[in-house]
């Protein structure tokens, strides 16, 4: 069973689940999923536009854009921005509905090492500033080192868990590598 905000989501009807997801869960994908026909601002606001909830969005948009350092690219086409900027736009879109939880599927998979570091720092900042739970799927140990807790799955089953416990990212990364070495991982 999966409980979010005292709701058993696995037992919801499909229509209720869709509304619940739109209102409570933000999604970040590896491949950005931005619409090239829209500029940065419209890509971020798209979930609100589709829900007819565009009123009072400007202040929220401004706050998110400042946190993610994308305020200066709002009018640009998404075809004219870097991969790291595209991922920050995708993160902003996931935040615009003020979700309780963000599910991130390999959010750094298409990024270079510097952009990976930047995106992970933004995600940590968002987690702390907005008090949003972030669940990330990754095969990247470096990206995982930014997390508070790492859960290893094998064949879809949890088999190991390691917590950061206020360690630095570099120390936690060494712990992750050591754990993977012990279990025969890469």
Give the ranges of each region predicted by the language model.
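Conserved catalytic motifs of ABC-family nucleotide-binding domains
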Residues: 98
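Conserved beta-strand-loop-alpha-helix hinge in the C-terminal portion
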Residues: 157-181
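Conserved ABC ATPase "signature" region
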Residues: 8, 56-73
């Amino acid at each position: 069973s999966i409980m979010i905000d005292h709701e058993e989501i696995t037992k919801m009807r499909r229509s209720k689940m869709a509304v619940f997801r739109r209102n409570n869960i933000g999604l970040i994908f590896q491949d950005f999923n931005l619409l090239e026909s829209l500029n940065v601002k419209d890509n971020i606001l798209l979930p609100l536009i589709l829900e007819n909830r565009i009123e009072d969005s400007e202040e929220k948009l401004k706050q998110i854009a400042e946190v993610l350092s994308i305020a200066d690219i709002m009018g640009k086409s998404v075809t004219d921005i870097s991969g790291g900027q595209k991922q920050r736009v995708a993160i902003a879109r996931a935040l615009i509905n003020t979700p309780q939880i963000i599910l991130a599927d390999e959010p750094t998979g298409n990024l270079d090492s510097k952009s990976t570091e930047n995106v992970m720092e933004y995600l940590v900042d968002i987690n702390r500033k907005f008090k949003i739970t972030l669940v990330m799927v990754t095969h990247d140990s470096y990206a995982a080192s930014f997390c508070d807790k790492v859960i290893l799955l094998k064949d879809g089953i949890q088999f190991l868990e390691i917590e950061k416990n206020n360690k630095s990212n570099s120390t936690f990364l060494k712990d992750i590598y050591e754990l993977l070495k012990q279990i025969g991982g890469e």
